[in-house]
Amino acid sequence: MGGMIGYSHKTHANAFTIELKGESLFHASITGQSVIGGIFGSLDDTQIQFTPASRLYMDNESLEASSGICGTLAGALSYQEPGKEILLDPEILVINPNIKIKGGNNVGGIIGKLYNGTLTGTYTPEFSTTNVIVSKIPRPIFPGNINSEKPYRENAASIGGIVGYADKSTLRRLFTQPSIYGRSTVGGIIGYASDTQISDCGVKTETFNNGNNSAIMVGGIIGQASCSSHLSFPI
């Protein structure tokens, strides 16, 4: 279920492409059982492109998947072949800082569940001579709330500021500022990362997991990471 498209998949040899142009405002709150996205519900082999002149204002008050898989841009996004890139510019994809995303598992600020995809932002960290980040705080690609208000989702897992669950994917140059809560595998960028690369990403948050003393696998960047061959985090 999505604000614009519920489900899309390719029907021919070439992947389907959605090109977003002009200005659009998404305001509706969306509630369902699973695979909920502010714009797209579930996309298979569907390329998303933003034109430089486009503006997407995500003014949704809330997005909720009672069982799980939820994100502001898409609930689930997957590709058969690697290398498909989505460019995320916070000046183009403008998300309401008061948005409330709720779900049980695989919940992310941008995408709930990502497979074989690449997300690239505009953030460039700057370092001092002593390798301390001195960059000014930029506009975050996701500034909202994920399961961060009562009643909490006590069993929520794979919760991330950008992606809830990422497999065989790449995230780079993304900055997020979420208020985030989960019971396990909670990360500022990715909740659960499997065979996934992360580089040049940053997180700033004042509310992280709401002091849940029983929470496990909680990380500023990644909640839990696993790999079958190699895992790269050149952060």
Regions flagged by a language model, labelled:
Residues 1-235:
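Predominantly extracellular/luminal carbohydrate-interaction, adhesion, and secreted-enzyme modules
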